[in-house]
Structures are given as C-alpha cells and as structure tokens.
Amino acid sequence: MIDWKLVARLAGGIAREPPGTGYAQEGLGSFVEDAESRIRAYTAIAPGAPLPAPELVSRRGWIDANIETLRPVMAALEHRLPARAFAAGPLGHLARSATGVTLSAQLGALIGYLSQRVLGQYDIPLLDPTGGTRLLLVVPNLVDTAERLEANRDDLLRWVTLHEVTHAVQFSGVPWLRPLLAENLTQLLDALELRLHKPPPLRMPDGRELHALVDSARRGELAMFAIGRKNRPIVERLQTTMAVVEGHAEHVMDKVGAEVVPTLAQLRAGLDRRRSSRSTPLRVIERLIGLELKLRQYRDGKRFCDGVAEAGGIAALDHVWDSQDMLPSSAELADPDRWMARTAPARTR
C-alpha cells in the first residue's frame, strides 16, 4: 500500500539538503571508543558485542536509513489492515490505492521534516532484536545547531555522540531491552486501527496540501491510525520504557560529558531550548498515530534517573537494568522515591 519511492522523493524534497559538511571522520572512531570506556566505567553496563562505527551522514542518508528501519514496521501494520479496513471489489481496491497515496505522502512529509531536526541516532531494527545497528550523526543539523546555539561545533558533536553511544551500550549490554521493545511495538501495531476522516485523493498532493502535511508533521497531528482507549496500557508501557532509555542517556551524557566536553553547561541550556532532536524512528510512529511526547520523554526520564542517582548513587540507578520488573511504572517515573522503596529488597540482595 505504501509507495516507498514516493516517500523517499517527498522526504528528500522537504529535507532541503544544505551544501558542505563541516566535520571530518578522522578521530571520531577513537572518541567513540573512549566514550564507551567512560560510559562502562560510570554505569557498569558491559556491551555484549562491539558497538557500530560512527557514521557522519547527510539528511538524505538519515532519510534512507530510517526508511529501511520503518519498512518492516509499516509492512507489519499493512498486513493487518485489508480484512477490516477496505471493502471487497473495485471500490475497495480504489480506496486502498488512495489511502496508500495519502499515507505515503504523510510519511514522506514527516520523515522529511524530522530529517532537518535530528542530530544523532542509534538505529536499531525495531521488530528484530537480532538485527544489525548503526550509529548515525547528521552533519548538516549538527552544524546548523551549533551555529544557532553559538556553540563549539566539536563539543556539540562529542556531546551528541555520547548520547548515542550510551544508547548503544544500553541496547547491547541489557539483553532483555531490545526484545521488550520489539514485543511492545508489536502489541501496539496489533492494536492500531485505520481511521479515515475523509476520502483520500487518488493523486499526489499539490503544493498547498503538502505544505499542510508538513505543518501537521511539525505539530504532531498526523493521526491516520488510532489506538483505542482499552489499549492505552500498551502505549504506557512503551512510553515508560523509552522514557527510562532516553532519560538514562540524558543523565549519562551530562555526567560523562563533564569530563570531555568543556562547554557542557552552554550546550545543555541550548539543547533544552531546542529539544526536537530525539533520535529514534519511534518518533515517526508516535506522530503518525498522534502520540508525540515532545518534552515529556526527556524531562520525566531524566528527572527520574537524576533523582535515583542523587538518592542512591549510580549503583542504585544501574539496577533499573536488572530485569523488566525493575523498570518504573508511570507513577514511579514521576516519583523516584516510590521506585526506590519498591525495589529496595531487590537492590540490597
């Protein structure tokens, strides 16, 4: 149903690739090795496999990588739609084709918009816990952000790289994390329903319609799929897990960054103002179904991790990775003391 060539063409047109690069690959590999060593020393999480080499990519390169990541996810979703979403016969086929054009245009607009914002990404196959991973750093966005923040470009690159390397250490060193993410996402896809508020056009969107799609992507309003109220616990589990993943990376990038990024305080203040750079393809899915979290995932997750580490040290926070049962509930995410009280017996064994 989705025309991926159309998705790529629209996304590339919206991305507006700027000329030039501004960063060199030289020395980045050694920095990643040093970052991994520092993160392991601070968190006591040991990766189970070598981390992927860092890649400096263009917006187009980020688009291509995310299309490949999203294709199996959307294919799994498409597989569930025909029997319940479209009538049989020629009219059903026509409706399916028109819906495919609309959905392709939405995805293209959304991916193109995000390609202008994302700074870095630890890219994992969302439904395949054993698939290969990539560590992507989006050069034009890093350059643009450094200029906007009036920040040191090399410091920004190091700091963002620390964030993504922390994700790499998490997902490689916590054996249950990727399977849990895949399981939760599969449950979410199973629960989604296709909702068409008006018949989609059987054609490419014109300039006015494409502009409206980009504006909707910016506001997180591309809700072509919806999840029923009874399935909200699935969403809550996925969101809470990702809040811990992101909050932990935010905590670590600041603690370890203090050792290697001289302008950390300036970067933290500037990035908190910018906060549109979350680095996972789940952002695309969230916006497509109206579940954009914006600041919440960073803010709540970091507040939880900072609170636990302040109360019990990094050793206490490390226990959040012991098992799925040690992940906080949504209530505990907002109140680290509740998590500390519940998990005290397990943490002291």
Question: What annotation goes with each model-predicted range?
Answer:
Residues 31-140:
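Auxiliary, metal-adjacent structural segments of Zn-dependent hydrolase domains
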Residues 108-119, 172-261:
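Post-HExxH zinc-binding segment in Zn-dependent metallohydrolases
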Residues 141-160:
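Short pre-active-site segment immediately N-terminal to the catalytic Zn-binding motif
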Residues 128, 135, 141-142, 146, ...:
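Terminal, compositionally biased segments used for targeting/anchoring and flexible tails
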Residues 1-74, 78, 311-349:
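N-terminal low-structure segments adjacent to metalloprotease catalytic domains
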Residues 25-28, 154, 242, 298:
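Solvent-exposed, acidic/flexible segments
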Residues 156-172, 305:
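Active-site recognition of the HExxH zinc-binding catalytic motif
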Residues 225-349:
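Pan-zinc metallopeptidase signature
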